[in-house]
Amino acid sequence: RFDPQDRDTQKKFYFFFKHRGIDLYTQYAFHRDFCLATRHRPDGQSYTNLAFPLRLPRDTDKIVGFEERGRARMDGSGSYKGKAEGSNSSAGLWIGSPAGTALRDATHVFWFESGYDAMSYYQLHQKDNRDLWKAVFVSTGGTPTVEQMRGVIACSRSARQHICFDTDTAGREFTDNLKKKIHRT
């Protein structure tokens, strides 16, 4: 785990955040909401990924999987992104808040396709919007499911929902689906 008081733990995360430009202060803000996960294969190989714990909106104490991101490749090309084996990605989402705000207590919920995107947004906008500290950030880890949408909306009915998906075709489709779900509720 990332410990804001322990430089040695922070160094282990450096290569996962460097290529995204996510600074140490943003890592401090979300330090409770990410970790490293290592998979050991039978052939002796092991792979460590940055992991964003997936939780059920109604039971955030229980981790039901991980959204995983690998280190950037040496040539600067992409890196591994996916979900840990056995993850409940149909209902589970990454849920983070710099202030530790519970989803049921949120006044603002920000929706993203990845934990990286959420942290980047926070870093870019927190100086101009001090309320972001108390906001709740959720990541669907890719394509949002009906179960994810229903779960978050049911737990945060009075919160203002901010849709921050990518602006590509898929992101616009996700936005339309989420808007419909919000209006039905």
Residues covered by each model-derived region:
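Basic, glycine-enriched DNA-binding surface that flanks or lies within the catalytic cores of DNA
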Residues: R1-G92
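Residues at alpha-helix termini
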Residues: K18-H19, Q123, R184
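Short, well-ordered loop/turn elements at secondary-structure boundaries
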Residues: S46-T48, T60, L103-A106, G115
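Short, solvent-exposed loop/turn segments that connect beta-strands within catalytic domains
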Residues: P57-K62, A102-R104, D128-L132
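Short, basic/hydrophobic alpha-helical segments
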Residues: N88-R104, V146-H162, K180-R184
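Acidic, glycine-rich catalytic loops of TOPRIM or P-loop NTPase phosphate-binding modules used
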Residues: H108-A170
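Mg2+-dependent endonuclease catalytic cores in nucleic-acid-processing enzymes, primarily RNase H-like
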Residues: I163-H183
